[in-house]
């Protein structure tokens, strides 16, 4: 069995990253893909469930996992911890499952260092005006919060060149097709094809 591929995907809030991943998972596809579920110490929100949206644990449990080096990456955001379990990621990859990891550029740097075979994708909006419009249409934040999100978005977008692939989310269906193309291309690269067809290649080259 060939090993799965870890895909890191990052984007500013409001770019449509979650919708894009959900859209991809709903389509019939050649490869088995799952989204990584992070651990967090924040309170569970209405509509969320343990093991589906996050693994909700206490700060004490999270700190123990840090000491045990159980996380590929973790961060503290607004007094709550968020982290990606090394064991769960490695288990899925060894089972031949591709994993999508939705994290910011700082977490992406940690993952690249620890898992250099991972591939990273950055998602950009078609314009600042469109990004602002999408944030407004969500109806979740005040004007002050939206302004702060826009400032943070510019900071995040400055790191796009650190990624392997870049997708502009202007047309939703085209963006999904671009994402599918990236996954297919990675599976067809020499490294993965050689591992997948090692027996066949050995037989073909036997004199």
From Swiss-Prot:
Keywords: ATP-binding, Cytoplasm, Kinase, Nucleotide-binding, Transferase. One of its GO terms (molecular function) is guanylate kinase activity. Residues 4-184 form the Guanylate kinase-like domain. It catalyses: GMP + ATP = GDP + ADP. Its main location: cytoplasm. It is found in: Cytoplasm. It holds the Pfam family Guanylate_kin. GO terms for cellular component: cytosol. SUPFAM superfamilies: P-loop containing nucleoside triphosphate hydrolases (SSF52540). Its EC number is 2.7.4.8. ATP binds at residues 11-18. Signal peptide: none annotated. The keyword Glycoprotein does not apply. The keyword Cytoplasm applies. Belongs to the guanylate kinase family. Essential for recycling GMP and indirectly, cGMP. This is Guanylate kinase.
């Amino acid at each position: 069995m060939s090993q799965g591929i870890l895909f890191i995907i990052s984007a500013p809030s409001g770019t449509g990253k979650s919708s894009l991943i959900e859209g991809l998972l709903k389509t019939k596809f050649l490869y088995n893909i799952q989204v990584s579920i992070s651990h967090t110490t924040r309170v569970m929100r209405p509509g969320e469930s343990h093991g589906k949206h996050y693994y909700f644990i206490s700060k004490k449990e999270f700190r123990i996992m840090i000491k045990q080096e159980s996380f590929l990456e973790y961060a503290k955001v607004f007094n709550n911890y968020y982290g990606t379990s090394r064991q769960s990621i490695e288990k899925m990859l060894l089972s031949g499952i591709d994993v999508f990891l939705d994290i910011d550029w700082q977490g992406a740097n940690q993952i690249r260092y620890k898992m250099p075979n991972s591939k990273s994708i950055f998602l950009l909006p078609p314009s600042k005006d469109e990004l602002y419009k999408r944030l407004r249409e969500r109806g979740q934040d005040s004007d002050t919060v939206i302004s702060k999100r826009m400032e943070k978005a510019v900071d995040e977008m400055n790191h796009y060149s650190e990624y392997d692939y870049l997708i502009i989310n202007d047309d939703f269906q085209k963006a999904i097709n671009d994402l599918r193309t990236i996954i297919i291309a990675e599976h067809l690269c020499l490294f993965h094809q050689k591992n997948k067809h090692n027996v066949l290649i050995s037989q073909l080259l036997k004199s």
